[in-house]
Swiss-Prot record:
The lineage of its organism: Bacteria, Pseudomonadati, Pseudomonadota, Gammaproteobacteria, Pasteurellales. This is Bifunctional purine biosynthesis protein PurH. CDD domains: IMPCH (cd01421). GO terms for cellular component: cytosol. Residues 1-148 form the MGS-like domain. The keyword Ion transport does not apply. GO terms for molecular function: IMP cyclohydrolase activity; phosphoribosylaminoimidazolecarboxamide formyltransferase activity. The keyword Hydrolase applies. It comes from Histophilus somni (strain 129Pt) (Haemophilus somnus). Gene3D superfamilies: 3.40.140.20, Methylglyoxal synthase-like domain (3.40.50.1380). It catalyses: (6R)-10-formyltetrahydrofolate + 5-amino-1-(5-phospho-beta-D-ribosyl)imidazole-4-carboxamide = 5-formamido-1-(5-phospho-D-ribosyl)imidazole-4-carboxamide + (6S)-5,6,7,8-tetrahydrofolate; IMP + H2O = 5-formamido-1-(5-phospho-D-ribosyl)imidazole-4-carboxamide. The IMP cyclohydrolase activity resides in the N-terminal region. The gene is purH.
Length: 532
């Protein structure tokens, strides 16, 4: 079996035309004849590139406003024909072999993302001929190269030069995988979009409204493997890191690594927790995370001050932690970190060249930049359970001063309100049951992941005491309501003066009474932030 087949004829039909003119010129320069359709053929001809319209080749015009272009035996016979097996039938029906197919599909995702997109708009952007050609060419990858990514153009031309106008079987197989990934993702987008819709002419209007939403009846996900890992959460577990395509928001998935060892499974999980927390703050902020829990968070006039204050919360836990900033990492801050502690990962929107030079002295430290961010983009969160997948909206909601309800007799001061909001933002990122003590925009003690809320409160106090931090005058945040007054009593005992929590317990009044007995401020958010 001949493994390499010279490319003599190619069919080009693309929606994304970036780079297609240069690629077509490169093919013609290498003696390849071109077939093309509609807008692609017009663009090539306008640039002086010799091209044959598919309709001229098949003798059958494009019809139905372009719905039928390439669905013809002379096209699919040329793509699917097996060299050395189907030659006679191809000759009998005057079918020329097509050795390369260059196709990308109608922009369905971009169309349905438009606020004014109608169902009719979506339907007209469902590609039929394109996926059919892609699948045909990918199926016959033994003989045909299928190109769906414009980013592959240069590499393909370079390989053709090295292989007498051929591509290796290994390359054609890799291109076929990309093609099936491309069509799978495309069909998934369509299925997800239609799965969210129930038209009123199918059901009663009220039921249709209830059924509509962002959760389709079948969920199709497409992620691309970015990294294979030495192991997973533990050494005996195999693991890999997959990312979504075209993510615009600054994230651990889109971050650029400037130096250091490859990120581990736990590094990525912890870095995500640190970065998402620090993104909550507009002032210069630092978040230090260990095992996906913040162990120190603070604001400052600059990130050096924020780092020093965050580290002060729990230096023991900060050892081997992840540090995230919401401003550029500068030389002074980088120096303070490297001289003070062992750190696994540092992530910031940008890193100054001087800071990068400082961090280079510790070659194993993973240094990442994620770019700047604006407001958070709504997305879905997933949690795998045995045999299923829990799906929910990401918890992006926060409260501001206007949302707070003061239920205690004592009213908070301006500084106390500022600290309460700071503390509440941190509590959102602490594993439940979560209790956070803070003062002057600095965490003082954090109690995480306890089965009872009162023990989280006690642990926050113990942590503060162990580090010699003053709890008296601090505020306290709880990610969920206090079911009993014991958490308030425990907090008052160590000197907490203000409490923020969602409220909503059957015993709310008992909890409020406890706050009043201790002359504490109590503020309700009416929003819970469980984190499991």
């Amino acid at each position: 079996m001949q493994l390499n087949h010279p490319i003599r004829q190619a069919l080009l039909s693309v929606s994304d035309k970036s780079g297609i003119v240069e690629f077509a010129q490169g093919l013609v320069k290498r003696g390849v004849k071109l077939l093309s359709t509609g807008g692609t053929a017009k663009l090539l001809a306008e640039n002086g590139i010799p091209v044959t319209e598919v309709s001229d080749y098949t003798g059958f015009p494009e019809m139905m406003e372009g719905r039928v272009k390439t669905l013809h035996p002379k096209i699919h016979g040329g793509i699917l024909g097996r060299r050395g097996i189907d030659d006679e039938v191809m000759m009998q029906h005057q079918i020329d072999a097509i050795d390369m197919v260059v196709v990308n599909l109608y922009p369905f995702a971009a169309t349905v993302a438009k606020p004014d997109c109608t169902l009719e708009d979506a339907v007209e952007n469902i590609d039929i001929g394109g996926p059919t050609m892609v699948r045909s060419a990918a199926k016959n990858h033994q003989h045909v190269a299928i190109v769906v990514n414009n980013s592959d153009f240069n590499a393909i031309l370079a390989e053709m030069d090295q292989n007498r106008n051929s591509l290796t079987l290994e390359t054609r197989f890799d291109l076929a995988i990309k093609a099936f990934e491309h069509t799978a993702q495309y069909d998934s987008m369509i299925a997800n979009y239609f799965g969210q819709m129930v038209k009123p002419y199918f059901r009663a209007e009220e039921e249709a409204e209830a059924k509509c939403g962002q959760f389709p009846r079948t969920l199709n996900l497409n992620f691309i493997r970015k990294q294979s890992m030495r192991y997973g959460e533990n050494g005996h577990q195999k693991a890999a890191f997959y990312v979504e395509q075209d993510v615009k928001e600054a994230s651990v998935s889109t971050a650029k690594q400037l130096q250091g060892k490859a990120l581990s499974y736990n590094n990525i999980a912890d870095t995500d927790a640190a970065l998402e927390c620090v993104k909550s703050f507009s002032e210069p902020a630092c978040v230090i995370v260990k095992h996906a829990n913040p162990c120190g968070v603070a604001l400052g006039k600059d990130i050096l001050e924020a780092y020093n204050r965050a580290y002060q919360t729990d230096p023991t836990s900060a050892f081997g932690g992840i540090i995230a900033f919401n401003r550029e990492l500068d030389e002074d801050t980088a120096k303070a970190i490297i001289e003070r502690q062992f750190v696994e990962v540092i992530i910031a929107p940008t890193v100054s060249s001087a800071a990068q030079e400082i961090v280079k002295s510790k070659k194993n430290v993973r240094l990442l930049t994620c770019g700047n961010w604006e407001s958070a983009i709504q997305r879905l969160d997933f949690k795998r359970v045995n045999g299923g997948l829990l799906v929910q909206e990401a918890d992006l909601s926060m409260v501001d001063l206007a949302d707070l309800e003061v239920v205690s007799k004592r009213q908070p001061t301006k500084q106390e309100l500022e600290d309460l909001l700071f503390c509440w933002k941190v509590a959102k990122f602490v594993k439940s049951n979560a209790i956070v003590y803070a003062k002057n925009n600095q965490t003082v003690g954090i109690g995480a992941g306890q089965m009872s809320r009162v023990y989280s409160a006690k642990i926050a106090g113990i942590k503060a005491k162990d580090e010699g931090l003053e709890v008296k005058g601090c505020v306290m945040a709880s990610d969920a309501f206090f079911p009993f007054r014991d958490g308030i009593d425990a907090a008052a005992k160590v000197g907490i003066e203000c409490v923020i929590h969602p409220g909503g317990s059957m015993r709310d009044q008992e909890v409020i009474d406890a706050a009043n007995e201790h002359n504490m401020v109590m503020v309700l958010t009416k929003m819970r932030h469980f984190r499991h």
